[in-house]
Amino acid sequence: MAQSDLYGVLGVAKDASQDEIKKAYRKLSKKYHPDLNKAPDAAEKFKEVQDAYDVLGDEQKRANYDQSGSADGAQGGFGGFGGGQQGGFGGFGGGGGFDDIFNQFFGGGGGQRNPNAPRPGRDLQYQMDLTFEEAIFGKKTKIKYNREAQCHTCGGNGAKPGTSPVTCHQCGGSGYVTTETNTPLGRMRSQQPCPVCHGTGQEIKEKCPTCGGSGHEEERHEVEVTIPAGVDDGQQMRLQGQGEAGQNGGGYGDLFIIFKVQPSKDFRRDGTEIYFDQDISFVQATLGDDVTVKTVHGDVKLKVPAGTQGGTTFRLRGKGAPRLRGNGNGDEHVTIKVVTPKNLNKGQRDALRDFAKASGESVTGSGKGNLFNKMRDKFNEN
């Protein structure tokens, strides 16, 4: 299937969000569900919608699909979320290779998966905004998000309470039907998903009134999250079992929280190291002073030696961000910025001229500022 077809099947743009994709999938799957739509091509369209969502509804598969331009390519790919999902480059849709293709036509069918095997649910992503300080010190918070959960009425089997799914009468529970075709090479056999059970191997005679036989229902889920001290912008945390419900008794997927850390107006951060600019006067820089410096852990005193030049950096050990795996904190690096006064009164200018004279310097500048300052100084002289 060409790249544009998958998005076209769901009727969404290529830059559609996951919410838009999921909304389109639910609408179309309900529209073409064979139990609700008796049109001859409903089952085929239902399968197309399902196949499209299997790829576009998974962030990693979608990324691989967008890059490779084929649905088969999207079924492999590298595992996402820091190795949480192992993967590789898929061949023939991630199956067993050429032998499966050969057996499909000549009767082997050896590459088909058990349709009744448990399948884990989808993983979800959640972006969490943090202030600079919250990322440094961590916090506990509760988050809410929508997810597909196991139906509380039927327990996930899709059947009306008091009933159970039964083995599909068409495929005998295999999930596939075999067709035979006469060709110049002889009589060939191929397997296709069962049109009755749609590959599940089971029929639901009386559907659950809550979920309509899907076994899932949407819920507003709440979970408490403990954010460790020292997380950084773009990092993510995995919460096992907080994703969406699986199929055939498969477990829930995982939730991946991606942190978005707001910048600080005072500090800059690089990993566990924090950087801060400290203003001092030229008198403090010349004579030295004990300066109060801001850190994320509170104010501290920094001894600035006499003769300190602008751009000099001091290290405050242990005043940086915590290391995620323990072993204390990083450091804060304080860069000195010497501030030159702009508006001097007459006494200050005279003192500086005396200083320049004592230093053997010849200074031609007047040291006077704008007209307002000149008038103010003249008034003070009187």
UniProtKB/Swiss-Prot annotation:
Q: What's a single GO BP term from this record? A: response to heat
Q: State the needed cofactors, names only.
A: Zn(2+)
**Gene3D superfamilies from the UniProt entry:** DnaJ domain, Heat shock protein DnaJ, cysteine-rich domain, Urease metallochaperone UreE, N-terminal domain
Task: Please state the residue ranges covered by CR-type zinc fingers.
Answer: 138-220
Q: Does the keyword Lipid metabolism apply?
A: no
Q: Which residues bind Zn(2+) 2?
A: C168, C171, C194, C197
GO terms, molecular function: ATP binding; heat shock protein binding; unfolded protein binding; zinc ion binding
> NCBIfam families recorded for this chain?
DnaJ_bact, PRK10767.1, PRK14276.1
According to UniProt, the name of this protein is Chaperone protein DnaJ
Q: Which gene encodes it?
A: dnaJ
